[in-house]
Amino acid sequence: VVVYDHHADSAERFCGWLEGKCTSAQRAVDLEQACRDADLVVFATTAATPYVHDASVFAQAPTVLHLSLRDLAPEVIASVQNITDDVEHSMKANTSLHLAEQQLGSRAFVAGTFADLASGTLQPDFSRPRVFSPFGLGVLDLAVASLVLDAATKAGTAMEIPGFHIPNLSWSS
């Protein structure tokens, strides 16, 4: 795992937290170094406005999970394959996709949705970066819920509600 943060001390603390949780964690000195050889790039920031204006940081055509939704400038969004969970919902609140729509005057830069990808009606374009912006999916909500459930189960305080959870599905079966 390669970690970059505008605040070096935050990156160092996160690398320390990752120690023992993954094979290795190192701090990058800049965003370009962090992205250079990555197959997967995850943006999880508190950025209120885009700060990534140069798409060349994704020259190796990675998959980009854009959780924080406001990191990428419209010119970057226009140059990648954009996939979102809900096109309408993602075009609000000055997200990167919303700003691109305002600048470009259309939504033609959105290739499709996660459902399109899952159903096979949309194929990933591996010749360029693929950016997934999950604005309405509630990914962080699910992660926190999973953490709480795991902790409650481990502590013996979880209450099972029969039929509430769908059993894990295997994509290989």
Where are these predicted regions, by residue range?
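Beta-strand segments within the central parallel beta-sheet cores of soluble alpha/beta enzyme folds
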Residues: 1-4, 30, 160-164
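Rossmann-like adenosine-cofactor binding region
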Residues: 21-99
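Hydrophobic/basic alpha-helical segments enriched in Actinobacteria
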Residues: 2, 23-27, 109, 116
